[in-house]
A protein has these predicted regions:
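Hydrophobic alpha-helical scaffolding
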Residues: 29, 82, 149-150, 183-187, ...
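Ferredoxin-type iron-sulfur electron-transfer modules and their immediate structural context
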Residues: 1-49, 55, 59-73, 123-136, ...
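Flanking helices and flexible, charged tails adjoining ferredoxin-like Fe-S electron-transfer domains
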Residues: 1-18, 24, 28, 56-74, ...
Length: 306
């Protein structure tokens, strides 16, 4: 089992223009007995890998599934990180349950602001689109209505719920042909994020819905024809609609509030605690999710499977 210091050094190698890393939050650093390897499972490029070795000398049960009576595990997991293979998709960050890995350029707050702008442009729809799809559809969609990401696997459930709390009823994670994409593993991550978000929407009784699709919503289409005026959509959308603007101003404030609250939770207990343990913390995305749920109101007393 690698030492805590070894894990910290390995994760620090991930720090780049694409990713922010706080190794102290990694479950493998905080608990040597953890089996968490979500980042490695999500990574589509082989930048983060976990290999498992079974000791031939370690006693095993006949079915090979459990350690023998001594209770010791016969399997040793080894983490390996090759920063040169990082493609900056952000899927590992979306998979990380503790915020040990966080995306940059854009970070979550910038991405949420882009999504809020798209929400205003469409009047209730947020469409994220991967780089393959945006390249294929260039010129066919209004860029003000689409939030570009390298891979839709970078989107996590907290962002989807946050956008629903800001007024989005339709949230699309739009991708190209994932089978031919180097980020293909991101589609499964995106589908899981939508599944989790939709379970929350059902529990809270909201009409919002998130889905992975290969087509952008009709509201995102570019206005074609010789009479095209780049300001026409904005004019039609805002003319005489002060209430509409006020609602979206409130949504912007809600998004800013959620991220400010998440930032505040990170300023406490940064040092080692008196007991000698690492500081406890609320993962930023968890804080954002809690803020979004508060804005959505009370749940409909539905039990969620977690």
């Amino acid at each position: 089992m690698p030492s805590t210091q070894t894990y910290i050094e390995l994760f620090e190698r991930l720090r780049s223009v694409h990713l922010h890393v706080d190794a102290r939050r990694c479950l493998a650093v905080r608990n040597r007995n953890t089996t968490c390897n979500r980042c490695a499972n999500a990574c589509p490029s082989g930048c983060i890998t976990v290999t498992t070795r079974t000791s031939a000398n370690e006693p095993r049960e006949p079915d090979g599934a459990k350690p023998a009576e001594n209770g010791r595990s016969a399997e040793t997991a080894t983490l390996a990180i090759d920063p040169e293979r990082c493609i900056g998709c952000g899927t590992c960050a979306a998979a990380c349950p503790t915020g040990a890995i966080a995306p940059r350029k854009p970070d979550d707050r910038s991405l949420a602001r882009q999504a809020a702008a798209a929400l205003r442009a469409t009047g209730g729809i947020v469409a994220f689109a991967c780089e393959q799809l945006t390249a294929q559809a260039r010129g066919k969609y209004d860029p003000d209505t689409v939030v570009p990401v390298r891979c839709v696997g970078r989107i996590d459930a907290s962002l989807l719920v946050l956008m629903a709390s800001a007024g989005a009823l339709t949230i699309r994670l739009t991708c190209g042909n994932c089978d031919e994409c180097e980020y293909r593993a991101g589609k499964a991550a995106a589908e899981l994020a939508c599944q989790d978000a939709n379970a929350i929407f059902d529990a809270w009784g909201t009409r919002a819905r998130a889905s992975v699709t290969r087509k952008l919503p009709a509201a995102c289409r570019a206005i074609a024809g010789p009479a095209y005026d780049p300001d026409r959509r904005a004019f039609l959308r805002t003319a005489g609609d002060a209430a509409h603007d006020a609602a979206h101003d409130a949504a912007d404030l809600a998004i800013d509030r959620a991220f400010e609250h998440a930032s505040d939770t990170q300023r406490t207990r940064r040092a080692v605690m008196e007991t000698g343990t690492l500081p406890r913390f609320l993962p930023p995305r968890r804080a954002i999710l809690l803020d979004a749920l508060e804005r959505l109101g009370e749940p409909d007393h539905v039990v969620l499977n977690t």
